[in-house]
């Protein structure tokens, strides 16, 4: 077998592999000898079939199997021999000429194929002893814990029916029917709907017109759907709602005590406070983690500059761009609305994709050298977390991860990345700094976020930069969540 390098340009490689017809025939004869005693052909005793006859009957099919095995097994063997790692699955090109293919299968012509791939660049790791990061830690006061508990307590608040008029804060139970131009519309009808006046659950102007109603009242109110309302057929339209008031109920007092804790399934108010404080600490801890991670990645980005495999960049950019398109479609906006053009946005997000791939390769190399591994138990926990996100779709998700090549890598990559960050935090200089929650949650204006002034793209860019690339720089498709049930048309979905 001859292995000839025909292209070595940057990270691109092209290898020509030639296996002589004589070699292929020899392999075929070996395979025929293996099956000689096993085949049964009419007119011949077992084991007495001439090789020439076997070749006539089975030659082409065996040769086809050999070709498939060579194409499957040789590329990784060749890469290993060359000491190279391919960024993606190497592309294999063979002759498409039918006559030439027939000659190869008949062992009358050499079998040739070409491998095309991009190599993962060799990365010489640098010391991170000079990397300095500030770990912001927010203090959590009792007032904040109390405020959060009171918000939670709203779900357990009791209401008592009253005879008077509805006031702000009261809960009304109503039937309603919405119409546009006198015609009822989908999602505009409900019965026994409970609404707390002032909760701003419904579109602007709806709740305010319920102030003063009493049980038994029938009323028609007029509102205008917001211009940005998700349902295009209702956005900006004036609508009427025929309302029947069934009950008006006044809110009970909310107190943080053992009774409230009991309603929430806890043994005491102290335990409730402890849990809420822990939740707040966890939320702030996630922000702290992402900010520290961002600082590390920014400095690694400055330390490592090298060419990136374009196929990985293409895949990463495609993933980012799909999300940008989705964000714009959902917001009903265009690039022009965001003071940019598609060309400029593509350029910005292309740079982001290159950064993510480059950092992914760096983190992969750091992790490999540090002996970072992802355990089977960690993968199982990640899979369980996926299942929790898609209730009712457990079987489909399990089948997806079992049957989709690369799907498990999609679970492994973020775990691997976080473990590499954990490793780096033991190597870099970390300074803790106590800050207010406002300072912790404030956007870092120094971040080089693509489309920083663009509402929809900005959201994606911030998320992309915060999470960065998967350690291997590749993406694997994941099951999409089922769409959430549509809200009633009267409700304001501008969350």
Swiss-Prot record:
It catalyses: [protein]-peptidylproline (omega=180) = [protein]-peptidylproline (omega=0). Keywords: Cell cycle, Cell division, Chaperone, Cytoplasm, Isomerase, Rotamase. SUPFAM superfamilies: FKBP-like, Triger factor/SurA peptide-binding domain-like, Trigger factor ribosome-binding domain. One of its GO terms (cellular component) is cytoplasm. GO terms for molecular function: peptidyl-prolyl cis-trans isomerase activity; protein folding chaperone; ribosome binding. Pfam families: FKBP_C, Trigger_C, Trigger_N. Its main location: cytoplasm. The keyword Protein biosynthesis does not apply. HAMAP family: Trigger_factor_Tig. Belongs to the FKBP-type PPIase family. Tig subfamily. This is Trigger factor. It comes from Rhizobium rhizogenes (strain K84 / ATCC BAA-868) (Agrobacterium radiobacter). The lineage of its organism: Bacteria, Pseudomonadati, Pseudomonadota, Alphaproteobacteria, Hyphomicrobiales. The gene is tig.
């Amino acid at each position: 077998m001859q292995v000839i390098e025909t292209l070595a340009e940057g990270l691109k490689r092209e290898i020509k592999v030639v296996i002589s017809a004589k070699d292929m025939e020899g392999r075929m004869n070996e395979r025929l000898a293996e099956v000689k005693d096993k085949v049964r052909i009419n007119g011949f005793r077992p084991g007495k079939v001439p090789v020439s006859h076997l070749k006539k009957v089975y030659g082409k099919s065996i040769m086809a199997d050999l070709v498939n095995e060579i194409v499957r097994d040789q590329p990784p063997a060749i890469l290993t021999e060359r000491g190279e790692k391919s960024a993606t699955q190497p592309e294999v090109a063979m002759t498409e000429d039918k006559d030439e293919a027939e000659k190869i299968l008949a062992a009358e012509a050499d079998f040739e194929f070409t491998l095309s791939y991009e190599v993962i660049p060799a990365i010489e790791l640098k010391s991170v002893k000079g990397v300095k990061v500030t770990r912001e830690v927010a203090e959590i006061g009792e007032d904040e814990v109390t405020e959060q508990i009171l918000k939670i307590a709203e779900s357990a608040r009791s209401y008592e029916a009253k005879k008077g008029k509805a006031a702000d804060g009261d809960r009304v139970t109503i039937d309603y029917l919405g119409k546009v131009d006198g015609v009822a519309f989908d999602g505009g009808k409900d019965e026994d709907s409970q609404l707390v006046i002032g909760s701003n659950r419904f579109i602007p102007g709806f709740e305010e017109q319920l102030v003063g109603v009493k049980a038994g009242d029938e009323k028609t109110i007029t509102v205008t759907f917001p211009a940005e309302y998700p349902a295009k057929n209702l956005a900006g339209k004036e609508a009427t709602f025929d309302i029947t008031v069934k009950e008006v109920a006044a809110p009970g007092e909310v107190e943080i005590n053992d009774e409230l804790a009991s309603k929430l399934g806890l043994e005491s108010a102290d335990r409730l406070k402890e849990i809420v404080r822990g939740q707040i600490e966890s939320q702030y801890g996630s922000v702290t983690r992402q900010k520290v991670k961002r600082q590390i990645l920014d400095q690694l980005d400055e330390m490592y500059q090298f060419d990136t495999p374009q196929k990985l960049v293409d895949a990463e950019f495609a993933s980012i761009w799909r999300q940008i398109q989705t964000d714009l479609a959902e917001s009903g906006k265009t690039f022009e609305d965001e003071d940019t053009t598609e060309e400029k946005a593509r350029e910005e997000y292309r740079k982001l994709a290159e950064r993510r791939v480059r950092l992914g390769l760096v983190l992969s190399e750091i992790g490999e050298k540090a002996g970072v591994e992802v355990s089977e138990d960690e993968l199982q926990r990640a899979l369980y977390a996926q299942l929790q996100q898609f209730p009712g779709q457990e079987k489909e998700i399990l089948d997806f991860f079992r049957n989709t090549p690369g799907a498990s890598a999609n679970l492994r990559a973020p775990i691997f990345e976080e473990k590499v960050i954990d490793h780096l935090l033991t190597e870099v200089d970390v300074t803790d700094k106590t800050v207010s929650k406002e300072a912790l949650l404030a956007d870092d204006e120094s971040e080089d976020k693509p489309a920083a002034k663009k509402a929809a793209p900005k959201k994606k860019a911030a998320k992309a930069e915060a999470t960065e690339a998967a350690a291997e720089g590749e993406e694997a498709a994941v099951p999409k969540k089922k769409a959430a049930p549509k809200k009633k048309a009267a409700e304001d979905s501008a969350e």
